[in-house]
Amino acid sequence: INTLSGVHQPTRGEMYTDGKPVSFSNPKNAQEMGIATVHQFGGTYPLMSIGRNFFAGAEPTKGFGPFKIFDRQKANSIAVEQVQRFGITRITDGDRLVGGLSGGERQSLAIARAVYFGARVLILDEPTAALGVKQAAHVLRIVNEAKRRGLAVIFITHQVMHAMAVGDHFAVLIRGAIAADFRKGDKTREAI
């Protein structure tokens, strides 16, 4: 995850984007190439609003010159619209605190944010960990929706059933080494 998202440099091998070799010296370089990482707990801030979380670090402003202020209405409107596009229709107020959302809704917020800001590759680190069955199913639907929209998704999980629900191509790692590499339908869940 850290190599793909620009935190660490690869010690060997090459990475390619659009058929061209790339290297990232920092996470911002990876983001500029359209690679977004959503970590296990979504990277949200529980005591901040949905609108503030959605735009953390890239807040829309209004005003002129040195007198610009955060445009809360615009941030809330866009955040609610984008989250609803991913099927979370019960979120209607961008001023609502993220701490009041379920784990699945927090993951969905983080995914919607990544898509809005131009992600083409979405790295999801254990997005269903610590979620209940219903919340995990919701996150899996969101992941499939992201795929339907044309995003490449790297879904990291220990849950074989979750991987099978969203994956097309699988790599099984044991202590960082590839133990198996196959496509959907090549192996049964039991064989994995």
Language-model-detected regions and their locations in the chain:
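Glycine-rich phosphate-binding loops of nucleotide-dependent enzymes
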Residues: 1-192
